[in-house]
């Protein structure tokens, strides 16, 4: 397996843009450092002002009403017998993928992960890749016009109508706490994978506690096979190792395995203020792919015991009732390009220091 990262400098081109005060016309070209949004690139290049200041929000809304192209070239030497899969996350939103002048795929859901087999579209040597973005507001309006009956949605003084007809972060179209910034772009690394028999996209690791107190770690590995075959799956966690042989047929497949871990080898994870937040690394290796993630070993249940006047709602962690204290998490920023891990870490540490132990993830963002 080989991973080729396509992050870095791309070209941003306006396609029939809406009327604006910044001289941006059809074919206007700029640099964009991917992954990021079109809005972030134009703001950082000082082509348009920061929408947070004064009434600049109104001055920059034309960006989300326009269409844009993001493209670059890259060298590749095709390896015999290999397949090539393009891995994409947080594609925002209505867009098409074009490789060497041929349309490969189209996307219309920001909340999905896409793994696109692009083998037949690549050549040895120089390859041209382009993402062509269509205004979500335009698409939403077309969908609204096609409906037999109108579907209402939240409206604000300055907003983008019909937000509920496009699968993207709803707050992009304005909210009571946020500005209207109908973003478009790609917000995670753009990765091309070279692989032979299998492409492994992800895995899950769920700890389950038995009545004796011992643990079972349930593993599911999600992959795509290009032909029938078999291979070895290796799993490690908490000093334990497990190796199993798995067989597969061509197409999407899921490999399932379980690892037994004695209770004495595990330190429990506790909410803030109740104990330590001990995390363990889980690593899997299969067909040249090595994936890892951190997990905490704990049980969580909601108890609805009958009490005077109704029922309780008590969250229990490791059998202990928890008095929940927390906050509602909205997106860190209206500009996706500024959502760094450092800012996430800082905010979460602030919540910890304020003695919070629960966070509700608001559903209208990322």
Q: Locations of the language-model features?
A:
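Secreted/periplasmic carbohydrate-active enzymes, especially glycoside hydrolases
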Residues: 1-364
